[in-house]
């Protein structure tokens, strides 16, 4: 079992308070979350939010984990082409601004999108930072399926669990809360495009209660493309509705 006491108090407090503001309680022992019934959550003051996940990487194609900086973060040719095609279709969404995250594969995705002339500006947002798998780079699900930290983070959904230099799901969701607060303060009534990671999409969906329970329909095999996924629809470089 993952020892939550190994996580700094300030980090746990940030996660706990950010999620509580959105009506989500965390069991401090297990790190498991659930919605608090009949709670009023903050409003979202923009008109719409969509997200484009970074382009497909070598890690995705090889079913490997990647960190923020590992060499397997480079894009596949297919990933670049899909993102280019998506960039040609953005006019119809009438985006006012695009916000993009701080890691290289997200910045590079933004650059691909902006190779097509767009009608919106791009703003870097440090908080738009999804899961960081430092310590697990180049490993597969089968390398990690018996790892206690992996089990805690991905199977038991412990919001505090992470590798020593990686990040937790709790931090990702707290980051999403910061992004929504930034949007409310700076982009009221606007149509927003986020360029980031798949974990940010899930974090946003959790805050905005898109499912009855935060982790409904989440599977590790689905998130990390375990086994033969040649017939599975992938959303790398593809736009998704958030709000």
For the regions a language model picked out, list residue spans one by one.
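Short beta-strand scaffold positions
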Residues: 100-101, 174, 195-196
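Short, active-site-adjacent cap segments at secondary-structure transitions
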Residues: 58, 105-107, 130-131, 200-202
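Acidic, low-complexity terminal tails and accessory targeting/binding regions
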Residues: 1-48, 131-143, 185-190, 203-243
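Phosphate-handling substructures
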Residues: 2, 59, 70-77, 114-175
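General small-molecule cofactor/ligand-binding pocket signal
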Residues: 50, 123-125, 240
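Active-site catalytic microenvironments for nucleophilic, acid-base chemistry
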Residues: 89, 112-116, 182, 186, ...
């Amino acid at each position: 079992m993952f020892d939550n006491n190994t996580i700094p108090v300030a980090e746990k407090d940030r996660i706990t308070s950010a999620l509580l503001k959105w009506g989500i309680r965390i069991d401090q022992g297990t790190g498991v979350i659930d919605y608090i019934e009949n709670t009023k959550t903050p409003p979202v003051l923009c008109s719409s939010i969509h997200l484009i996940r970074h382009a497909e990487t070598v890690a995705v194609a090889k079913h490997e984990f990647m960190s923020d900086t590992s060499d397997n973060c480079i894009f596949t040719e297919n990933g670049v082409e899909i993102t280019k095609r998506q960039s040609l279709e953005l006019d119809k969404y009438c985006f006012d601004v695009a916000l993009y995250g701080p890691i290289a594969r997200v910045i590079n995705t933004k650059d691909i999108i902006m190779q097509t002339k767009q009608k919106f500006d791009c703003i870097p947002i440090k908080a738009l930072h999804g899961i960081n798998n430092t310590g697990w780079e180049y490993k597969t699900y089968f390398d990690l399926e018996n790892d206690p930290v992996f089990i805690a983070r991905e199977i038991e959904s412990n919001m505090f669990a992470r590798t020593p230099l990686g990040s937790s799901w709790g931090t990702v969701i707290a980051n999403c809360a910061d992004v929504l607060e930034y949007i409310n303060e700076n982009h009221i009534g606007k149509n927003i495009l986020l360029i980031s990671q798949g974990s940010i999409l899930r974090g946003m969906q959790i805050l905005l209660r898109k499912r009855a329970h935060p982790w409904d329909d989440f599977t590790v095999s689905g998130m990390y493309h375990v086994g033969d996924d040649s017939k599975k629809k992938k959303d790398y470089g593809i736009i998704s509705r958030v709000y």
